[in-house]
């Protein structure tokens, strides 16, 4: 199935196929909590969520935490956790606080994040496994509102949603990446730390 985010939006299709007890695997350059908000109902019902940043993120030499550092982070892909500029314009501070809290609670229960440690290209996309059903999306540059089709994009981009058996080849190497401790590392706690900063920053 072709998805152009005009006649058919990626987010709507993902809501249909992210079923209870699914395992969701994503590889993308950025993760936005506003994209999480759009898929939250479906993501609350899954068993496991694994996300790989396809570019180095949260590297040790970049982390010098200050209370407001998240507002102007060193790395754009880390800033995207709190929304791209167009997403931030859509949300007031109370909404941002609520979403950050919900996302942090969900991450603690369901999600793990890893990042590649070297500047080497790897495949991006989505793989959803539920029993014998496997769905895949062949491209996912960023996990954000624009990529999901909920914010207008200047240029039309196409991606494809596959069912088995065509879906089986996409992100087949994901677990190899996930279990590779030499070139990938777990950053789940760093993601939680950033979300906690956002929540505290917007607390009265």
List each language-model region with its residue ranges.
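PLD/PLD-like phosphodiesterase catalytic module centered on the HKD motif
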Residues: 1-204
């Amino acid at each position: 199935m072709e998805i152009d985010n005009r006649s058919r939006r990626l987010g709507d299709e993902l809501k249909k196929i992210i079923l209870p007890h699914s395992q969701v695997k994503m590889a993308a350059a950025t993760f936005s909590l506003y994209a999480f908000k759009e898929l939250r109902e479906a993501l609350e019902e899954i068993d496991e969520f694994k996300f790989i940043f396809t570019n180095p993120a949260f590297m040790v030499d970049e982390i010098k935490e200050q209370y407001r550092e998240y507002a102007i982070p060193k790395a754009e892909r880390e800033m995207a956790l709190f929304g791209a500029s167009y997403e931030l314009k859509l949300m007031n501070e109370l909404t941002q606080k609520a979403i950050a809290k919900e996302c942090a609670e969900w991450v603690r229960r369901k999600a793990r994040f890893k990042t590649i440690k070297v500047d080497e290209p790897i495949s991006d996309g989505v793989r959803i496994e539920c029993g014998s059903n496997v769905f895949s999306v062949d491209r996912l540059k960023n996990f954000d509102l624009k990529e999901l089709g909920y914010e207008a994009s200047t240029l039309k981009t196409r991606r494809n949603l596959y069912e088995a058996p065509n879906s089986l080849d996409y992100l087949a190497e994901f677990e190899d990446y996930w279990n590779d401790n030499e070139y990938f590392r777990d950053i789940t706690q760093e993601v939680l730390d950033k979300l906690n900063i956002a929540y505290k920053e917007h607390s009265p």
